[in-house]
Amino acid sequence: MSDSEKLNLDSIIGRLLEVQGSRPGKNVQLTENEIRGLCLKSREIFLSQPILLELEAPLKICGDIHGQYYDLLRLFEYGGFPPESNYLFLGDYVDRGKQSLETICLLLAYKIKYPENFFLLRGNHECASINRIYGFYDECKRRYNIKLWKTFTDXFNXLPIAAIVDEKIFCCHGGLSPDLQSMEQIRRIMRPTDVPDQGLLCDLLWSDPDKDVQGWGENDRGVSFTFGAEVVAKFLHKHDLDLICRAHQVVEDGYEFFAKRQLVTLFSAPNYCGEFDNAGAMMSVDETLMCSFQILKPADKNKGKYGQFSGLNPGGRPITPPRNSAKAKK
């Protein structure tokens, strides 16, 4: 039996999208074999494509989703369901939210169906030691079994780490690394791989910008570093880039600039965990590399679910809890 016979993608995507318009929280229970098939086939595609993706605009870039499946559906309603728009997601698909399984399954299904138009980077939560603690393991165990969680781990270990859009926009989940001198260093990272506790791969998934730091600083998460505006400016100049686009931190308006608009943080899970009153955002990059932001307001708030937003509100920036915090978030 061929892969396409084993994996009825259109049926899988159809069932995942059937709950659009239902009360948020309604589950979609794919079969275990279907999910295993999604993991195996997507892993094959990830490994066949570069670890440092070279992408072309136009595309839409999204930050953390964290199992907020109904908000992911709203993002697609707003931005256009694939293949209407090209997408790059910056990682953190699982953990914290209630529906990590639906979230990751839809994303993997779209990756398989549109491999040249739909791209997923690895976040720090696409790592067994993290999603063992923050919810994904428990969701897999409750709804399926631990073996399936291990199958997801195999797929996550093959995800690409960074992307460059039209040679000008550098994208990753976390941020820069003091070890990063050449893009070739990223290309040399061998997959499949776990996320180490330190070094280049760790930093790309874990580091954070900090306006109060000059150069490199300690990170409150207990892992990786923080970096200042000058680090950003030097990196962009050295590599002839215009912008760093990253995720990894809750920001009040769904997007937030840093270092004179040389770096932008995107966060795409509105009303994160039901605890923050943040908006979610995605960044549209057009053919001329002009960036605009589409905003998802917290669903239960304002009458308008969507809004175009161009102003800035620096706001406070709550950070996701540190890696070495052993408390799972229920």
Curated annotation (Swiss-Prot):
Q: What is its EC number?
A: 3.1.3.16
What does the UniProt entry say about where the protein is found? Answer: Cytoplasm; Nucleus; Nucleus, Nucleoplasm; Nucleus, Nucleolus
N-acetylserine occurs at 2
What does the record's cofactor remark say about binding?
A: Binds 2 manganese ions per subunit.
| Disordered: region residues | 306-330
Name a Pfam family for this protein: Metallophos
Q: Which residues bind Mn(2+) 1?
A: 64, 66, 92
Question: What name does this protein carry?
Answer: Serine/threonine-protein phosphatase PP1-alpha catalytic subunit
What organism is listed for this UniProt entry?
Canis lupus familiaris
